[in-house]
Amino acid sequence: IAPTESPRAEYETLAGKYQGKRFNSPNDLAYNQKGELYFTDPPYGLVQKEKDPKREIDFQGVYLLRKNGQVALVGKDLERPNGITLSPDEKTLYVANSHGPRPIWKSYELKENGMAKKGKVFFDSTEYRKKHPGRKGGNDGMKVDVDGNIWATGPGGVLVFSPQGKHLGTI
């Protein structure tokens, strides 16, 4: 992490490993109000992705870096976890899966300790892609507004969803 007001090539590693194994390539992140950091770890930074001989973790995970420096595995049910954000009340975690054959966004209800209960598909962009074949791009970064609407980059632009997962439109 480098301060933006005086950027320089000095970085502090907050977390580099899970259970003694180096992360694949941490990607997107979201802080909660406690100062804990949720982040995704797809294989995009590895030259050969899942087949890279330097790969140490054999899955792509979603993690929580606690304030005490401990890393907890939140989930490993996505092939390409990418964009990540929290609902305004921080009771729901949203994660984009940018895997071509299964392009979905999932929502996870969070327990009091910040860990996820079983997730559910929030929006599957497979049918959306079929209806709009000219709209290129995959599920990626996202943010939530004060009303809980999710603004997510995806096929053809920024898709806007209600908190219930209804597609409101695309910019």
Could you say what each language-model-derived stretch is?
Residues E10-G16, L73-K76, A116-D124, G169-I171:
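Beta-propeller fold detector
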Residues A2-P53, F59:
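Asp-box/WD-like beta-propeller blade repeats and closely related beta-sheet repeat scaffolds
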Residues Q19-L37, E56-G61, L73-V95, S125-P155:
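Beta-rich, blade/repeat-based domains predominating
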Residues I1, L37-L46, L93-G100, N149-P155, ...:
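Conserved beta-strand positions in repeat-built beta-propeller and related beta-rich domains
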Residues S6-A9, K67-Q70, E112, Q164-H167:
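Short coil turn/linker residues within repeat-based beta-strand modules
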Residues I1, Q60-Y63, I104-K106, G157-L159:
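A short loop-to-beta-strand structural motif that recurs across blades of beta-propeller domains
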Residues P3-S6, S107-M115:
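Short loop/turn segments immediately following beta-strands, especially the blade-tip
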Residues E56-Q60, R102-I104, A116:
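A detector of repeated loop/turn-to-beta-strand junctions in beta-rich toroidal repeat architectures
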